[in-house]
Amino acid sequence: MKLSLKLALVLVLVICVSLLFAAGKGDAKKGKEIFTAKCVQCHGEKGEGRPAIEKMFSVKMRPLSSKEVQSKTDEQLQKEVLDGNGKMKPVKLAQAEAADVIAYTRTLAAEKK
């Protein structure tokens, strides 16, 4: 194979992989809307957790802005949202909606600073 053809194939591959990863990122604005509709009842307006929920389920909720939560990968967070985590039941969302919620929760750490 000619060198120029090999370079062209590598370039196409790099572009495709970049687009694939870019497509996986959510929309924080949409995520805030979904969070408000489906998550705020337990997690609170800014993801700080609600004391009544903690008491009801005998759990200590980590703030979504915490280092412990923010250090998780998007994939880990998506699994927790879609499959549930401990006493948190799975949330019925499409994968794209879950990605949007995760993008929004990433903004909570920035607001904390």
Question: Which role does the model predict for each range below?
Answer:
Residues 29-33, 37, 75, 79, ...:
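Solvent-exposed, polar/charged alpha-helical surfaces in well-ordered, non-transmembrane soluble domains
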Residues 61-75, 89-99:
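Electron-transfer interface patches adjacent to heme c in soluble/periplasmic c-type cytochromes
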Residues 78-81, 92-113:
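C-terminal capping alpha-helices of c-type cytochrome domains
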Residues 56, 61-64, 80, 85, ...:
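Short, functionally important structural connectors and interaction interfaces within domains
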Residues 1-25, 110-113:
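N-terminal export/targeting leaders of redox proteins
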